Every structure is written in structure tokens, then in C-alpha cells.
């Protein structure tokens, strides 16, 4: 059963600055009494806020980002996914204690809620907002400073289907049902009760357990895998009880009856066993599927390595198309009724490319009588091959061999039309053109190609640059008209002429911006008129649009005023510069 337990203040707050802002001993005792001997699941921040490991229970931390940080904490169970932790610990009652994100994710899986509600506000900055529609309040318990509410899931509500199937634990009633004075049930349940300390191992009669175990294995129908696994667990229980029963006089402090290391070790092994038992059907299915497949052994790649007689970068002739060759060979094999392999298990001899290549070449020479001016169809070539050899492996190998023979210039392949079959002929050795390049020539040709490519790229970039400057110059001439000057001309101007040019160009820029704004306003107004014609506006819309028009008029007046102000400033600056030049000239005349 999955249970959620947390404490909240009057405003549903659960934490402040990632810490619990209250310290109420009575509420803390209630938490320990409720969760002791049960696994607890928490988020990373909750683990930091606790600042300790709770004893007598499995501490499970859910975190994706802090796996390395907590990896050496052997007393913790680390999970990156809440759902996986719920599945692994689904055989026992567990509690989820926080924080906010973990509680909100887990409530859809919860069977019971235990909420401690405080009577005061503690100024929290972290709150839980949950929907309790799927739960009903079944019990309340009042304390001095808080009230505990117990909620249970309504019978007509369901958990998410994906988790229900995985949490559906079916204990096999036929497998080793035990019966003792204080216990009756399967071995699975016994281990879980001892694991959760719901049953004292010292009160367990291991002799009676062993007798019942041997009585079970004496039956005819048993599962040896399950029997051996549970026998191992029984031996572990026997060892634990022996360690607790026999005192160690050499070191009296060595045996600690409250130590949970052994219990935690058994818990981990049970979880590990459960994982493998769940994976076993899938592994068996994969094993059966693998038996129905056959693998191709590794080829000898030495036959594909280049030798001194091989041509470097030798292309196939223009009239040879591997795709057409493949289609032609498929038609040949269809006629020979060799389409697919239907047997699942067959014994295959390793095919050598060299042997198949020599076989095909010898058949071609035999059919053509070593004549170089005759052609033979592929269909006739493969009719000479032993039918027992014709299968998919031989088809693929022969396809590669034909390409190799063409590359080695031993045969030629020709096809007049796409629908016709491909014909083969022998190549006259005296007419073979040796187009092989030396290594130095290949390297030199590659270097020249790289150099030509760089020069071509550089030339293209320069052309683009000149084209850009030319387009920019034409644009500026069209924009500024008589006030346009080139860079060279601008450097030759006097300061007064430069200022005059700048003032006029700024006026043109501002006028252009103003024209664009007016044009956009006209477009917007036309769009609004069209919208008004197609859709009757409400009174509220009319008032809103009137306010918008008034605001646009105000902005237009302000912009016009700014234009006047800027123009006045520029003219004043121009006047000051002229006065400054006049004063400098008068000073020079006086000095002379």
C-alpha cells in the first residue's frame, strides 16, 4: 500500500527556505510511530532538511541530478524515477514523506493520506495544492497543536493503468505455503514480514520451516529455480538467527540487536531477485527469437585490400550501372524461383569471393569460347551454376563479384534498354587502357584542386564585396540626391561643408522615417476601416479606437515639435560654427 504523510500549517505551507520552520515533539513522535519499520520515499531537498538517516526503515531518495553525490551513501536507496521506486517496493507498505514535487507526483498512486494540520501560520514559502476528489476523510485525531486527518482512496477511483499492472503482485499459493504457530502463508510473505520487522526472527521455528521445505521439494512437480532461490533465503535467515542466538564473548559489542544491516541486505537481494524474475519471460522470448536467426560469419577483408596491380580511383565504365545490374539479377533469380529462404535453421558453407569470381569468369569464357567480340546474357550464365548453390548468399556474393570483374577490366557489362537483360563480354587485354596514377601525381592533383578551389572562393567573395558596395552607392545616391558624396569626396570637404552635408542628410533620414510612419498609419487605418465594414464594432470598441486615434494624434504633434526643435538646434550649431570660424580669422589678422 502506498501512503503519503506530511505536515502543513494553516495556509498549507510545508517548508520555509528548504527547512521545516516548526519543531513540535508531539508531531515528530506521531511521524516516527507511523512510519517506523516501513520504507520511506523522499526528494533530495527533504533528505537535506532531515540531515540524517531514519533508523529501522529503508530510506529511499528520488533525484536525477544528485546521483553521484549520494552514490557512496550505502544506507540509501537511490532512484531517478519515482515510479520505479514504487514498483520495487510495492510488496510492502511504504510512506512518501516529501517534498512538494514528490507528493504532487505520487498522489495519483496513493492509497492513503496522513496529513498533520497545524493550528498556526509559520510563514512558509513552499505550499502543496492537491485535489482530494479521489479520496474520502475516514478519521481525524486531535492533538494540542495539530490535527491528524486520515484519507483513503474511494473505491470507485483507479490509479494510472500503467502502474497498476506492474504493482499487481501475485503470490503463488501453490509454492511452499508455510504454517507456524503465529504465521500462515507463502514464503514471500514470511520474508516481507521479517524484513519489515513485523515478525521477530527469534520467534521463527527454523527447524519446522526446514521440514516443510523438504516436504515440498519431495513433490514431483517443482520449479528448481524458485526452490533454489528460496533455499538461499532460508539459509540467510538461519545464519542471521544463529548470529543473534550465539553470543560472542570475544567482542560483546559486535552483535547489535538493533542493527539493520542484515535486514537491509536482504531487502536489496529481494528487490534484485524481483527484477530478474520480472525480466525472465522477456529474456526467454528474446532467446527463442534468437534461435530462429542465423548469422553471417566474418569475411576475410584481405581480399578487398588494394594491391600494386589495382587501379586507384578507377571509375566504372559509363554504361555500367550497379542498380540496373541488381535489378537484372533479381529478374534472373525470379525466373530461377530463388526468391527467399524459408528454412529457419540451415547449414551454410562459407562462400569465398575469389572462388565465386573465378567460377563466373570461367563460365563466361566457356560460353564465349574466349572470344572478345561476343556477349552472353546473365540468365544463361547463372543457368550453368549448380542449382543447390543458388540462394540469397550466393546472389549477394555473385553481385559483388560481377562488380569486381568489371573494376579489374576482365569483363564488360552492357544493357541496351532498361527493360532488357544485361549482357556480359570478355575484355581484350590488348585494349586495356592503364589510367593508373602514381601516388605523387594523385597528391599533386589534389593540391592543385584545393588551390584552385581557394582561389575560386576568394574571387567569388571579392565579386560579392564589389557588388555590395555598388548597390549601396546606388541606394545612397538615390536617397540623398545632391547631398550624396563618396568617401573620397567627403575627406576633401571643409568642416563647414561636412556639417552642412550632415544636416541635410539627417533631414532626409527624418523625413523618410516620417513618411514610413505615415504610410504605415494609412495601412492600419485602411485595415481598421475594412474590419469595421466587415464587422460591426461595439460601443466599447468604438471608444477604445477613438482613444487610440487621439493618442496617435498627440504622438504625431510631439514628433513634429521634436522635428522643429532638432532643426533649430542644428541651425544654431551651424551659426555657432560660422561665428567661431569668423573669430579665428579675425584673431589671425590681428596677429599678422
UniProtKB/Swiss-Prot annotation:
Keywords: Cell cycle, Cell division, Chromosome partition, Cytoplasm. The keyword Transcription regulation does not apply. Its main location: cytoplasm. Coiled coil: none annotated. GO terms for molecular function: dihydrofolate reductase activity. The keyword Cell cycle applies. Transmembrane segments: none annotated. Residues 156-592 are annotated as: ScpA. GO terms for biological process: cell division; chromosome segregation; tetrahydrofolate biosynthetic process. Gene3D superfamilies: 6.10.250.2410, Dihydrofolate Reductase, subunit A (3.40.430.10). It is found in: Cytoplasm. Participates in chromosomal partition during cell division. May act via the formation of a condensin-like complex containing Smc and ScpB that pull DNA away from mid-cell into both cell halves. Belongs to the ScpA family. Component of a cohesin-like complex composed of ScpA, ScpB and the Smc homodimer, in which ScpA and ScpB bind to the head domain of Smc. The presence of the three proteins is required for the association of the complex with DNA. This is Segregation and condensation protein A.
Amino acid at each position: 500500500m502506498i501512503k503519503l504523510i506530511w505536515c502543513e500549517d494553516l495556509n498549507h505551507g510545508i517548508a520555509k527556505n528548504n527547512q521545516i520552520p516548526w519543531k513540535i515533539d508531539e508531531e515528530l513522535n506521531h511521524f516516527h510511530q507511523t512510519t517506523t519499520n516501513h520504507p520511506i520515499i523522499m526528494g533530495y531537498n527533504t533528505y537535506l532538511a532531515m540531515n540524517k538517516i531514519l533508523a529501522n526503515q529503508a530510506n529511499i531518495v528520488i533525484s536525477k541530478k544528485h546521483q553521484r553525490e549520494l552514490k557512496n551513501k550505502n544506507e540509501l536507496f537511490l532512484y531517478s524515477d519515482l515510479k520505479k521506486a514504487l514498483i520495487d517496493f510495492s510488496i510492502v507498505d511504504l510512506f512518501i514523506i516529501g517534498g512538494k514535487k514528490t507528493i504532487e507526483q505520487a498522489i495519483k498512486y496513493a492509497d492513503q493520506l496522513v496529513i498533520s494540520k497545524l493550528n498556526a501560520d509559520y510563514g512558509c514559502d513552499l505550499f502543496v495544492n492537491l485535489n482530494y476528489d479521489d479520496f474520502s476523510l475516514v478519521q481525524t485525531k486531535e492533538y494540542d497543536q495539530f490535527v491528524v486527518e486520515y484519507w483513503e482512496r474511494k473505491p470507485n477511483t483507479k490509479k494510472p493503468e500503467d502502474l497498476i499492472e506492474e504493482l499487481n503482485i501475485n503470490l503463488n499459493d501453490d509454492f511452499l505455503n508455510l504454517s507456524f504457530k503465529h504465521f500462515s502463508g507463502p514464503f514471500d510473505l514470511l520474508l516481507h514480514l521479517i524484513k519489515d520487522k513485523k515478525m521477530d526472527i527469534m520467534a521463527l521455528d527454523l527447524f519446522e520451516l526446514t521440514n516443510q521445505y523438504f516436504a515440498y521439494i519431495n513433490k514431483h512437480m517443482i520449479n528448481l529455480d524458485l526452490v533454489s532461490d528460496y533455499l538461499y533465503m532460508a539459509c540467510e535467515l538461519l545464519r542471521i538467527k544463529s548470529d543473534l542466538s550465539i553470543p560472542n564473548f570475544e567482542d560483546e559489542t559486535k552483535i547489535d540487536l538493533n542493527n539493520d544491516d542484515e535486514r537491509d541486505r536482504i531487502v536489496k537481494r529481494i528487490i534484485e531477485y524481483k527484477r530478474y524474475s520480472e525480466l525472465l519471460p522477456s529474456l526467454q522470448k528474446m532467446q527463442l527469437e534468437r534461435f530462429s536467426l542465423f548469422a553471417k560469419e566474418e569475411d576475410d577483408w584481405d581480399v578487398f585490400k588494394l594491391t600494386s596491380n589495382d587501379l586507384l580511383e578507377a571509375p566504372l565504365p559509363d554504361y555500367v550501372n550497379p542498380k540496373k545490374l541488381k535489378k537484372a539479377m533479381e529478374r534472373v533469380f525470379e525466373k530461377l524461383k530463388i526468391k527467399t529462404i524459408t528454412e529457419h535453421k540451415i547449414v551454410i558453407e562459407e562462400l569465398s569471393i575469389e572462388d565465386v569470381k573465378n567460377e563466373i569468369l570461367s563460365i563466361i569464357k566457356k560460353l564465349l569460347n574466349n572470344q572478345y567480340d561476343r556477349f552472353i546474357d546473365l540468365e544463361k550464365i547463372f543457368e550453368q551454376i549448380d542449382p543447390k548453390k543458388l540462394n540469397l548468399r550466393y546472389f549477394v556474393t555473385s553481385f559483388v563479384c560481377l562488380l569486381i570483374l568489371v573494376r579489374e577490366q576482365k569483363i564488360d557489362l552492357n544493357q541496351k534498354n532498361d527493360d532488357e537483360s544485361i549482357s556480359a563480354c570478355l575484355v581484350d587485354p590488348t585494349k586495356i587502357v592503364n589510367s593508373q596514377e602514381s601516388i605523387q601525381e594523385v597528391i599533386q592533383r589534389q593540391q592543385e584542386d584545393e588551390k584552385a578551389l581557394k582561389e575560386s572562393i576568394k574571387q567569388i567573395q571579392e565579386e560579392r564585396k564589389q557588388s555590395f558596395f555598388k548597390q549601396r552607392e546606388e541606394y545612397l545616391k538615390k536617397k540623398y540626391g545632391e547631398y550624396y558624396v563618396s568617401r573620397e569626396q567627403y575627406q576633401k570637404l571643409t568642416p563647414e561643408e561636412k556639417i552642412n552635408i550632415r544636416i541635410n542628410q539627417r533631414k532626409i533620414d527624418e523625413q523618410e522615417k516620417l513618411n514610413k510612419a505615415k504610410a504605415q498609419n494609412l495601412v492600419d487605418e485602411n485595415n481598421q476601416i475594412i474590419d469595421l465594414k466587415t464587422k460591426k464594432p461595439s460601443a466599447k470598441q468604438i471608444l477604445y479606437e477613438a482613444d487610440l486615434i487621439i493618442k496617435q494624434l498627440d504622438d504625431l504633434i510631439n514628433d513634429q515639435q521634436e522635428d522643429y526643435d532638432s532643426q533649430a538646434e542644428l541651425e544654431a550649431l551651424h551659426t555657432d560654427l560660422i561665428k567661431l570660424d569668423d573669430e579665428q580669422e579675425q584673431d589671425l589678422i590681428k596677429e599678422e
